[in-house]
């Protein structure tokens, strides 16, 4: 049976996400920015939290873990990098590990760059990836702890996922990401269509996530830094993908 997924807002612009296995009743939160919105989402559905799958140690992704752990006695899964302080962890995971949420199987991808400990969770049967702050809709995370080559390698891992996979990310940044991307590729038809869609969704008060990996591969300039069209957009014809990516990220940091 297909998993049920619920998306909701936490803090100011964070997304909270629940993935639920109807066969067993198991429910996992992908990160826990704060506890109350997670509790409210669970109560609306009549679900009980069994797991928290942490992507990285930033406070806006783990701020609700302690309270949720106390309330539900749920299992807390976190990246294996112990240099990042994350409290209440029951299980540490790394590249290729499989996490069971009831009958649902989540595969761990190490996607460092934004932070050194960052992981993404891929549920292949459900055709969904939870990429948190590595890959955003039409964007990517800032490189705080890693290097540009490290982040580019992480994006390539995510780009290898099938086009049909849905992407859930950690923040509602799509509008600003599109405005930046249009400065690089003002004539990209997929990007322009996405811009119109995002304007409509935001006007209706609806989230711009999830998006499809196939769409990201056509419109996300960070994910396409090795595309000659993107290189031309930053006047770096012939440069490597990682060189173009670094230039894009530097420009976005200043925008």
Swiss-Prot record:
This is Hydroxyacylglutathione hydrolase. Zn(2+) 2 binds at residues 60-61, 133, 171. Binds 2 Zn(2+) ions per subunit. Monomer. One of its GO terms (biological process) is methylglyoxal catabolic process to D-lactate via S-lactoyl-glutathione. Transmembrane segments: none annotated. The gene is gloB. It holds the Pfam family HAGH_C. GO terms for molecular function: hydroxyacylglutathione hydrolase activity; metal ion binding. Disulfide bonds: none annotated. Thiolesterase that catalyzes the hydrolysis of S-D-lactoyl-glutathione to form glutathione and D-lactic acid. Its EC number is 3.1.2.6. It comes from Nitrobacter winogradskyi (strain ATCC 25391 / DSM 10237 / CIP 104748 / NCIMB 11846 / Nb-255). NCBIfam families: GSH_gloB. Its cofactor is Zn(2+). Zn(2+) 1 binds at residues 56, 58, 114, 133.
């Amino acid at each position: 049976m297909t998993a049920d997924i619920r998306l909701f807002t936490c803090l100011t612009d964070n997304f909270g996400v629940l993935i639920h296995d109807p066969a067993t009743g198991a429910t996992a939160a992908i990160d826990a920015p704060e506890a109350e919105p997670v509790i409210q989402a669970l109560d609306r559905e009549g679900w009980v939290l069994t797991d928290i799958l942490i992507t990285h140690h930033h406070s806006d992704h783990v701020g609700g873990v302690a309270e949720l752990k106390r309330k539900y006695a749920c299992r807390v899964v976190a990246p294996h990098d112990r240099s990042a302080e994350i409290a209440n962890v029951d299980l540490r995971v790394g590249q290729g590990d499989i996490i069971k949420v009831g009958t649902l199987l989540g595969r761990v991808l190490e996607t460092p760059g934004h932070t050194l400990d960052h992981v993404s969770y891929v549920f292949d049967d459900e055709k969904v990836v939870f990429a948190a702050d590595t890959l955003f809709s039409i964007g990517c995370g800032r490189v705080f702890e890693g290097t540009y080559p490290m982040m580019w390698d992480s994006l390539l891992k995510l780009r290898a996922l099938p086009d049909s996979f849905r992407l859930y990310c950690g923040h509602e940044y799509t509008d600003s990401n599109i405005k930046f991307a249009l400065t690089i590729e003002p004539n990209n038809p997929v990007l322009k269509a996405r811009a119109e869609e995002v304007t409509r969704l935001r006007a209706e008060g609806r989230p711009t996530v999830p998006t499809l990996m196939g769409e990201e591969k056509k419109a996300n300039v960070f994910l396409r830094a090795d595309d000659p069209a993107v290189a031309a957009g930053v006047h770096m014809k012939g440069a490597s993908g990682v060189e173009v990516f670094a230039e894009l990220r530097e420009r976005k940091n200043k925008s």
